């Protein structure tokens, strides 16, 4: 912006014309204000994506995320979507449509922050096919087991940090057996990719877990349901500290589920 201001100041000399100083200053003020407004118009969600995924998102311009590989991705398609459409056909903006309430242990109706995953965005980062994801996976030690996890965006290192901290709490050990991490598949009953497909999600303690359909058989996605959870809050807080969201904070709860989604936590700070 400073270069443009200097250009405005020297423009009369370059063109060989006389321009009243007050008029020139007015032009500079207007230009500066317009530039400032343009900078402030970056959606908060886009700013967060740039902050937490710097290896893939380098900027935002004219409604598009600017990716580090030189491509761009529409941030908001402008469509008004139903709850299910945000899950099945979400854009990057839709990922921030729901509240991840870290101050309550009982989710509000239809607040499923993290269940909306823009598939082109996640496939850009983690891999567009099963083979592409698998070739990046690394082994992470998890309480006597080895689980496959992606190192992309620091996810595997974050899981290791979770394990290190949980190891200080032997009383929690019975909840920590892995029930699965990487698994390329669709979400049950839907046509959208499961978060497990990207290798940045782990299920734990299935024997002590609760799932909304287990407790509410036959209920639809927009029905009122009853909540249940047996996973200790201490486990949840440790995962969240290292960038993971918990499926137990969803209205459509899945309490075994921990998913590396630092953008959701950044958008919903404590």
What do these predicted regions represent?
Residues 25-33:
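Bacterial N-terminal signal peptides
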Residues 242-270:
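A cross-kingdom marker for long, charged
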Residues 41-250:
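Cell-envelope/glycan interface and biosynthesis
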Residues 8-24:
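Bacterial N-terminal signal peptides that target proteins for export
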Residues 36-39:
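Boundary at the C-terminal end of the N-terminal hydrophobic targeting segment
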């Amino acid at each position: 912006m400073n270069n443009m201001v200097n250009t405005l100041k020297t423009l009369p000399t370059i063109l060989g014309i006389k321009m009243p100083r007050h008029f020139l200053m007015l032009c500079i003020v207007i230009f500066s204000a317009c530039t400032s407004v343009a900078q402030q118009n970056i959606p908060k969600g886009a700013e967060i994506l740039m902050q937490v995924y710097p290896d893939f998102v380098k900027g935002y311009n004219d409604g598009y995320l600017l990716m580090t590989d030189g491509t761009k991705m529409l941030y908001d398609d402008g469509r008004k979507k139903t709850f299910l459409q945000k899950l099945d056909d979400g854009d990057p903006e839709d990922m921030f449509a729901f509240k991840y309430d870290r101050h309550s242990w009982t989710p509000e109706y239809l607040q499923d922050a993290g269940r909306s995953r823009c598939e082109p965005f996640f496939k850009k980062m983690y891999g567009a096919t099963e083979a592409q994801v698998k070739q990046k996976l690394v082994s992470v030690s998890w309480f006597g087991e080895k689980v496959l996890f992606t190192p992309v965006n620091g996810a595997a290192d974050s899981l290791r940090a979770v394990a290190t901290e949980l190891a200080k709490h032997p009383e929690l050990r019975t909840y920590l057996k892995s029930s699965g991490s990487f698994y390329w598949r669709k979400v049950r009953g839907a046509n959208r990719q499961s978060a497990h497909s990207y290798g940045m999600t782990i299920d734990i303690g299935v024997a002590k877990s609760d799932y909304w359909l287990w407790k509410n058989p036959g209920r639809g996605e927009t029905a009122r349901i009853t909540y249940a959870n047996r996973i200790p809050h201490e486990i949840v807080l440790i995962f969240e500290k290292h960038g993971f969201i918990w499926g137990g904070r969803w209205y459509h709860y899945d309490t075994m589920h921990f998913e590396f989604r630092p953008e959701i936590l950044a958008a919903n700070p404590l």
